[in-house]
Structures are given as C-alpha cells and as structure tokens.
C-alpha cells in the first residue's frame, strides 16, 4: 500500500519546501523504497506555462510535455523517479476538471461546492500522482502543498489532505511542516513565536504535524527545540533544525543525521535497511574540492531572478563537477550588450551561454553576443532562443541575408530564417497544428522528441546517432533557408525524423573550436551524478579555452 507524507509551509514562502521534500525523498530512496513527489500549487493558472519567469521562476518541462513548477526539477535531480504531468497540478486544473464534470452532469444535479467536490477532486489527483492502481505505484508519495498556511488559496488543499489522511487510516500518512525562526540581531536570539502561531493555525484546520523543519540562519539550540515542542505538541525528536548551507546537496545528510527519515519510517511502519548516503557525501566532497574554476557568461533577459534559469544553473554546476572545476556563472542582461560593447562585456569569460526566452526585448543583445562568440572563437552554447539568435546572426553576417530575423520579433522581416511551426508530430504519433491565432497556453511543441544526428559533427561526438531531448518552443528554423545557410558554412547537424525541423546547428571544428546551438532544453535532463553530455562538453571546452589565455 502506498504511504503518504504531506509537506506544508508556514510563516513565509520560499523557505525551501521543494528542497526539503526532495531531500526526504532521496533519503527514503536510499533506504530501498520506491518514492515519488507531487507538487500542489494553489494558484488559479492551469499551469505555469504562460506565467512570467519574474513571477514564478523557471517552467520545468517533463518528458510527457507537462509545463510544471521548478520544484519538479529539484525532484528529478534528487531521485530516480521521472516526473510526469500527474506530479504537478494547480487550483486552475482542479477547477477546470470539476467544471467539466459539472457540465457533463457527473454530479447528478447536486450543488457543486468546495467541500466535497473540489476537495474530492484534489484527492483523486493526489492518488493519480502516486500511481495508485497502476504499475507505477510507489511505496511512499511525498506531497508538497505550495503556498503558506493561512493563505486563502491553500485552504482547499489543506482540507483535502486532512480528509485523505483520515481515509488512509493511522500509520499510512505523516505531516511535515516547514517553518521559519527569525534571528533578531538586536536581541541576539531566535524567535519561536511565528512557528507557534503557524502550527496553531495548522491545528485549527485539523492537522497535527509529526515533524517540524525549522529553517534558520544557524542550527537551532536544544532549549529552543524544547520550547517549540512544548507549544506545538510535536515530540522533541520531531523538531528538526534546517540551517543555511552553501550547497543544497548537504541537506539530505543534515536531515538524516537528525533522524527525520527514521521518524517517518516509524510513523508509517516501514521496515527498511539503514540509509546509505555515500553518493551524497561524495557529491558534497566534489563541490568543495574543485581543481580549478571557469567563468561562464549567461546572457539573458530574466537576470534579476536566478530561479528563471534554475535548471541551466544546476546543469552547469553538474558539468563542472564532472570536470572537477568550480563554475562561476555571471548573469548578464542582454539589453545592455551591443556590437560596440560586446568585447568589453564578454572578453573575460571562458565560455558564453544564451538560454531560452520569449519576446523581442533584449534579442539584439543576444545576437551581438552570438556574433562576438563566433568571431572571437569563444565556446558558445545556445539553448532554444540561443540557437535561434545564433542562426539569425549567421544569416545576417555570413550568409549575406541582410535583415534576417524571426517572425516572433518582426512579422514582416525580409528574411524570416526563424518562423512559427504550423504542424508537427508528438512522440505518441498524434499530429498537432496551430497558427498565429492559437492560445498561448498549451500550444507549444512540448516534451521529449527524437532526432537523427549527422555523423562527423560535434553533436554526434556528444550524442551519437540519435538525440532525445525535451522541447518548449513555438518558433523553429525556417526550412526554406536551410540550403542557403548550409552553403554559407553553417552545419545543420540534427533534424527531426518526420518534419525535418532543425534541432542542432553548429560551426565546423576548422572554423570554430566549439560553437553549437540546440532547439531543445538539455538542462532538464542533467543530474548531479553524471551531469549532461552537452553541458559536460561545454565546460570541457571552457577549460580548454582557458589554457592559452592562462599562458598568455
């Protein structure tokens, strides 16, 4: 039978519920259990696909094409289970499902209410995420309830998990509550009052936490733990300290040493071998003992919020570990870069990366960045839009197509080398179509797709004969211009098998040591254990580029 752990948060948001949930899952997995994670988001958007990265951070894409919360990226990087559409749902998706049922008459004329109809639907979605009744069923499903206890948006979710816990019966569910202990510098002490109040609020709803994860700047003293235990009705060994660390990969060991996994296994009556966290210890050692450092310039438009490029940041760090170097990432605003100042802004970096994005703001700066990298033979990796700007730059300055652009930025440009895809086939064989009037939400080319890779290319040395990666885009290299670009020397090294859409462009080794653009998002498949072949090759190229510069 699948057991459930419900993770809630209090006092403030952004405490790290996603990391805490993923860390607990990783420890339980190391005990030999099959684990999955489910993220419940209280906002009314159907999914985060149309939300601004400034509002929400990165949109993480799964193999089955779901646009999900960035926490699912943490989940995939921490545990072996792959995430799917069912692992993330929102208030919007719940209400959409309830209203569709009401229109079909599934409720037999009853008045549709939050309790029981919405709360029942939430419970069904949770069970679906846990794979109950399917071959994907797990031993433990960890459900992270987004938002903060006390938010009006979270109430239906908290009521739903309370009801589900009751239905599951004793020893089949546990509650973990993440809270915050502020440090008052003037008084020189940690304050427990906000934690007392947030647990009081949770208990009013009918939920008694089994464990409290207390986020603080430093470890929580024992006398404070005793006080928290007394006022929250949580056993003292269930009051667990979560202090700030320099790498998230230290969190599993931190929680294990304070007995969180033992407490959960006892509560859920799970008889397992002891946790083996050796690979996490090795990972932490690798991050703390680099043999060098490389400087990477990431040129984008959402640079004020690093969460907008969370998976790219992590993939670069993973690749650094594979090459035993520390990767120092500098986020540069593409709006500040021009052909005239590109050298001044970019000369000190060992490699340049242009990540994905949407809209025309800052795009000319990205084109200038691609030009600088090409002309100065700096290793360049373009992802999604980064591949498109590299194509536009090459068309303008090498292929002689003056005025080349994307129809996303200029609908009437003279040479639309990048244009809207109107038809493509999904991995399951269904043909999707769209036009300029299609809704923004859910109309992109999404999820895992496979392409053939041309032998003798840089891409082939990285991927082999076939590349399967996740996509999230509406625009694509225009097939009508491929021959002109090839004639001018651009290598189209991977094409999709059915539509012959461009997946990878690159420059020959004789022209540039390492210059590649990919239409897909490789960052979503990077893991701390092996990195990702494309990012690993990129960081190796950065290390190589550093050598002559270091000698000089």
Swiss-Prot record:
Residues 295-548 form the Glutamine amidotransferase type-1 domain. Residues 1-270 are annotated as: Amidoligase domain. UTP binds at residues 13, 191-196, 227. L-glutamine binds at residues 357, 385-388, 408, 474. CTP binds at residues 13, 151-153, 191-196, 227. The keyword Transferase does not apply. The keyword DNA repair does not apply. One of its GO terms (biological process) is 'de novo' CTP biosynthetic process. InterPro entries: Class_I_gatase-like, CTP_synthase, CTP_synthase_N, GATASE, GATase1_CTP_Synthase, P-loop_NTPase. Keywords: ATP-binding, Glutamine amidotransferase, Ligase, Magnesium, Metal-binding, Nucleotide-binding, Pyrimidine biosynthesis. Allosterically activated by GTP, when glutamine is the substrate; GTP has no effect on the reaction when ammonia is the substrate. The allosteric effector GTP functions by stabilizing the protein conformation that binds the tetrahedral intermediate(s) formed during glutamine hydrolysis. Inhibited by the product CTP, via allosteric rather than competitive inhibition. Homotetramer. Belongs to the CTP synthase family. This is CTP synthase. It comes from Acidovorax ebreus (strain TPSY). The gene is pyrG.
